[in-house]
Amino acid sequence: MDLHTAVYNAAHDGKLPLLQKLLAGRGREELEELLGEVAGGGTPLLIAARRGHLDVVEYLVDHCGASVEASGSVHFDGETIEGAPPLWAASAAGHLAVVRSLLRRGASVNRTTRTNSTPLRAACFDGHLDVVRYLVGEHKADLEVANRHGHTCLMISCYKGHREIARYLLERGAQVNRRSAKGNTALHDCAESGSLEILQLLLGCHARMERDGYGMTPLLAASVTGHTNIVEYLIQEQPGHEQLSGTELPGEGSSQVAGNHCSTPEEAEPYESCCPTSREAAVEALELLGATYVDKKRDLLGALKHWRRAMELRHQGGGYLPKPEPQQLVLAYDYSREVTTPQELEALITDPDEMRMQALLIRERILGPSHPDTSYYIRYRGAVYADSGNFERCIRLWKYALDMQQNNLEPLSPMTASSFLSFAELFSYVLQDRSAKGNLGMQLGFADLMGVLSKGVREVERALQLPKEPGDSAQFTKAIAIILHLLYLLEKVECTPSQEHLKHQTVYRLLKCAPRGKNGFTPLHMAVDKETTNVGRYRVGVFPSLQVVKVLLDCGADPDSRDFDNNTPLHIAAQNNCPAIMDALIEAGAHMDATNAFKKTAYELLDSKLLAKSTVQPFNYVTLQCLAARALDRNKVPYKGFIPEELEAFIQLH
């Protein structure tokens, strides 16, 4: 173990005597090095603050000159926080004594992490009320600094259910109607977490029932997450709001602080008069809650109970609230339509499958196709069908969800990428199942695979049309890899000549986009790289793949294309020791003696321990023109401007 690691470990374990021994007599420069970041990204001071070792913290700052602002990486709840200062780590862990010590020694109370999280937010996250009071009350920590998502300290306190912290922040003037980057408010966070008491507290401070970026009210948010207590309160109860300062916190005065005037019991309005819920909103909330009971809670009887109440409200007082007529019935939903009468609703008791379709229909109508939950639960229902062996229903539902995602989400959305990967894994399983069972297995048709492959190419086209190209994006590389896996599977399915032509047209569309993955890899580079195999949890295709390479070459892939290190696909095939693929590339016109950025040919990259070299004879493919080009390059003969441009490009190839 080196000295730097030993110092870090001593600080981590709170072993002050050992730390003093290790650092005693060191010069300033050596101390700076030893107190810097270790390989994991943290500093000795940062980890000591994280672990609450007050004596170690004060020794490192007072005697060793450690900076109280030096940030690094620290781990909390399985997550790595980048750019965290020591005060943030101590606040997140609830070490009040360390927090006091660091602030006395000059730490900035509002210094943020890389994601713009403050020490106050860190304390709010895990419910450290004493730290929150100290940061705000003694050091005037800014309540309104939001993280990179626009999420404030009040919002995270509400989401985590820390009632007393939320109460304290409101008393200190936290903005109750502040909106995040996605448009949600603290009320949304209460609704999503089921914190009814905090929700009542916020309403007492005149919180407004706003819609977020998806058009969701807190009422709908509670329905989506299945918090019946919130839904019931918002649509039915009419209590006075909870007093903000019914029992004043020590050292605090009136409930009107920094502009927040929250209700006392005498002046509180009934809920229905200050934030009335319309009959239509209540109906939709109950219908959506029922859908949540079907898919999330798997409680069909509970769902029926909520749907009955919604139906009663629709018919209440003789003024029927009609459901909008669907523009067309959906094959994926088995052409189901929503029930509109109490009799139709009661008939669902005998048909659980129809109930599940009702849940999907209701969710799509109320949330709309752009809400993530809409496509998520369609995919979930498809997965349940697949688990029971009903692959056809699964494929229909997943295709419908994929169309919905591509029409409503941004290109390369993680949800869309997940859909493509799920398709690839399902198709791989079905083909293996068919191979094992023969005629008893499901017939996976060309149209199923081809349809998804075409949508995958469309996703790449959409991504490349964005103002900012995806470049070396890991998500973009994964999208290309999944397309190659789908092509790999498609090669296992028999095709008619017209289907073969359609397949080649689609691959040509992909190549025409000229997409580039990691390190500038073209699809042909990726097809000859073993890393392309690792695309998900389950194996789909195996790469390098000769079949995929041949299809790409047949459709016009350039065998001499270069990545960022000037490697051709031939170089990558050589690194992966694939002589058969190398032969195919050479037959397609790849230059055997083309060199990369390190002046290596593909032949020189072959593993000498394997027999691959004996099957590839470079001199069978090297021309006199190639030898002349290499001689010019090797001897540094000036040629630019003296020969035609085509010849210049040829020499540069070598």
From Swiss-Prot:
Changing residue 108 to A: Decreased ability to promote PGE2-EP4-mediated inhibition of inflammation. TPR repeats lie at residues 283-317, 375-408. Preferentially expressed in cardiac muscle, brain and liver (at protein level). Also expressed in skeletal muscle. GO terms for cellular component: Cul2-RING ubiquitin ligase complex; mitochondrion. Disruption phenotype: No visible phenotype in normal conditions: mice are fertile and develop normally without any apparent malformation. In mice model of chronic inflammation, mice develop more severe colitis induced by dextran sodium sulfate (DSS). Mice display less microglial accumulation; decreased microglial activation is observed in the brain after systemic lipopolysaccharide administration. Mice also show behavioral abnormalities, possibly caused by monoamine deficits. Mice display reduced anxiety-like behavior and brain inflammation in a model of Alzheimer disease. Keywords: ANK repeat, Cytoplasm, Mitochondrion, Phosphoprotein, Repeat, TPR repeat, Ubl conjugation pathway. ANK repeats lie at residues 2-31, 40-70, 82-111, 115-145, 149-178, 182-211, 214-243, 519-561, 565-594. One of its GO terms (biological process) is negative regulation of inflammatory response. Component of a CRL2 E3 ubiquitin-protein ligase complex, also named ECS (Elongin BC-CUL2/5-SOCS-box protein) complex, composed of CUL2, Elongin BC (ELOB and ELOC), RBX1 and substrate-specific adapter FEM1A. Interacts with PTGER4. Interacts with NFKB1; the interaction is direct. The modification Phosphoserine is found at residues 108, 608. It comes from Mus musculus (Mouse). Gene3D superfamilies: Ankyrin repeat-containing domain, Tetratricopeptide repeat domain. Disulfide bonds: none annotated. Substrate-recognition component of a Cul2-RING (CRL2) E3 ubiquitin-protein ligase complex of the DesCEND (destruction via C-end degrons) pathway, which recognizes a C-degron located at the extreme C terminus of target proteins, leading to their ubiquitination and degradation. The C-degron recognized by the DesCEND pathway is usually a motif of less than ten residues and can be present in full-length proteins, truncated proteins or proteolytically cleaved forms. Belongs to the fem-1 family. Residues 242-265 are annotated as: Disordered. The lineage of its organism: Eukaryota, Metazoa, Chordata, Craniata, Vertebrata. This is Protein fem-1 homolog A-A. The keyword Coiled coil does not apply. InterPro entries: Ankyrin_rpt (IPR002110), Ankyrin_rpt-contain_sf (IPR036770), TPR-like_helical_dom_sf (IPR011990). Induction: Up-regulated in ischemic hearts. GO terms for molecular function: ubiquitin-like ligase-substrate adaptor activity. It is found in: Mitochondrion; Cytoplasm.
